[in-house]
From Swiss-Prot:
Belongs to the PlsY family. Pathway: Lipid metabolism; phospholipid metabolism. This is Glycerol-3-phosphate acyltransferase 1. Catalyzes the transfer of an acyl group from acyl-phosphate (acyl-PO(4)) to glycerol-3-phosphate (G3P) to form lysophosphatidic acid (LPA). This enzyme utilizes acyl-phosphate as fatty acyl donor, but not acyl-CoA or acyl-ACP. Keywords: Cell membrane, Lipid biosynthesis, Lipid metabolism, Membrane, Phospholipid biosynthesis, Phospholipid metabolism, Transferase, Transmembrane, Transmembrane helix. PANTHER family: GLYCEROL-3-PHOSPHATE ACYLTRANSFERASE-RELATED, INNER MEMBRANE PROTEIN YGIH. It comes from Bacillus cereus (strain ATCC 14579 / DSM 31 / CCUG 7414 / JCM 2152 / NBRC 15305 / NCIMB 9373 / NCTC 2599 / NRRL B-3711). Probably interacts with PlsX. GO terms for molecular function: acyl-phosphate glycerol-3-phosphate acyltransferase activity. Pfam families: G3P_acyltransf (PF02660).
């Protein structure tokens, strides 16, 4: 059962997810809305396509740090891995479906990566190894990245997390795969 402090933290996590790095950077640097540029997605990939590698890196880091901070603070305050995974889900949902932007956010991958590193860096390193193998096979980022993300629940089991925490990780994966389906 979630107590009132945890509930408030989940709401805050969702709202923090609403902070879209790509939107902020393009508004500050170019006074434009990235959602009107390129693919229209306020994420690192679109920023890289429209403005170059530096903007990709800045957006990736901003969104990843957002996920990492939410998860790291949750680990410190609450310690329960299941609740911490729930906060990762909340910040990702906030990034993908931000109420502040009428539900039109990014695809959640950068936020997921940052949050996962803060959740359990060993799982993140394991997934990095899996990604490298698939990257060498497919010679691209998208397909290996999505395959790697889909391996998270297996890693959760291998690293002895509870079934509930593993199911939450699976929900995160289904959500990310759904918004990245095209």
């Amino acid at each position: 059962m979630i107590n009132s402090m945890q509930f408030l933290y989940l709401v805050a996590s969702y709202l923090i997810g609403n902070i879209l790095t790509a939107y902020i950077v393009t508004k500050l640097r170019h006074n434009v809305d990235i959602r009107d540029e390129g693919s229209g997605n306020p994420g690192a990939r679109n920023m890289g396509r429209v403005y170059g590698k530096g903007y990709f890196i800045a957006t990736f880091l901003g969104d990843a740090i957002k996920g990492a901070i939410v998860v790291a603070v949750a680990k410190y305050l609450f310690e329960d891995p299941t609740f911490v995974m729930l906060t990762l889900l909340a910040v990702i949902i906030g990034h993908i479906y931000p109420v502040l932007f009428k539900g039109k956010g990014g695809k959640g991958i950068s936020t997921f990566i940052g949050g996962l590193i803060a959740f359990d860096y060993l799982i993140a390193l394991t997934l990095l190894g899996i990604f490298i193998v698939f990257y060498l096979i497919f010679k691209g980022f998208t397909k290996p990245g999505l395959i790697t993300i889909a391996c998270l629940p297996i890693c959760m089991i291998l690293y002895s997390y509870s079934i509930v925490t593993t199911i939450l990780s699976g929900i995160i994966i289904v959500l990310i795969l759904y918004v990245n389906r095209e």
